[in-house]
Amino acid sequence: MRDDPVSFGLPEDETGDILAMVNLGDIMEVFTENSTFKMVSPDTLDPDRKHQETPWIYTKTSHFGASNELVANTILLANEFLEQLFSIDSPKRLVIIQKVRDIRNVLLEYLCSLISFTEKLKEEIDKYDFNKNEMNGRAHAYFPQIKNIDGIATELLITAKRCIQEISVLVNCFITLKAKHGRIDKLLSEIESEHDNANELIEVLRNNLAMCEYIFSLRNSQEHAATTDKPLIVKNFNIENGLDLSLPKWGIKNDALNFIHIQANEILNFLITFFEEVFLACIILTLPNFPVYKIYFNDAPKKEKPIRYCLNLSIPDTFYERSSQS
């Protein structure tokens, strides 16, 4: 029956322990070290309670679990902080964690595109290395090329830009703003004029503005390539210096070109860190005067759940001494 006690077990082909559960309102996400599951209650499936036999259902939604740094330092980090500051039924907690879930999903989309690209890159390099000693006249028997490389660049840059926009909108979940801003410079301008007490958030946005604008410029130069004097240049495998194999690169015309796989990975790391910094700066704005909380950097995160920051109650020494003596 739907109202009977329920226990959640992993499918037979899954191993490991449940390391975290995140309440997202209509669903619950369950995390093992290497997987994420979505669990849906009977009340979500049958809100009018017309069918007493409606079951709980769960499905595997991702092969990335709590041990993935992206997962750990987005939704799991946010959940641990929010659980300490808000009740489980708090509407504000729900709005924030759902937005963080959206950001996590965009980042996972980016990560999957990057993994797919790097796997294709390795496959082409391996084929080239295997065949490079075989020549047909002066031509290589096999020369590597990434199919649809412009489409891959589009996937990466659209997703990176969308992630920045989602992080920008996350701020609206914490403080009142006149609009939802898709650009960090616009967000920063309003916060500086309307929320000058948000010192940490202002500093975070200022420090990350240049990189956000650079990512936007890469995407915009590609999107408007036909109408701009500085389009995005995307180069496939090439031969440089007469005989050196050059890996795929991208860059804005007349600027230096960068290896796609290296810069795309740098962008991913930036986006995760940018989320962390914006989220923590917003959390600071919501901390009560009492009890006193402090945010700590975890310099030895656990392998199975490598969350980099934690929120702890700051207990005065006098209180601790008095408690230990009683």
PLM feature segments, named:
Residues 152-156:
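Eukaryotic low-complexity, intrinsically disordered regulatory regions enriched for acidic, serine-
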Residues 111, 118, 160-164:
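Hydrophobic faces of stable alpha-helices that mediate helix-helix packing
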Residues 1-112, 134-151, 169-326:
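Acidic, Ser/Thr/Gly/Pro-rich intrinsically disordered interaction regions
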Residues 114, 118-128:
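Extended alpha-helical scaffold segments
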Residues 157-175:
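Extended, well-ordered alpha-helical segments in internal regulatory regions
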Residues 126-136:
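Short E/K-rich amphipathic alpha-helical oligomerization segments
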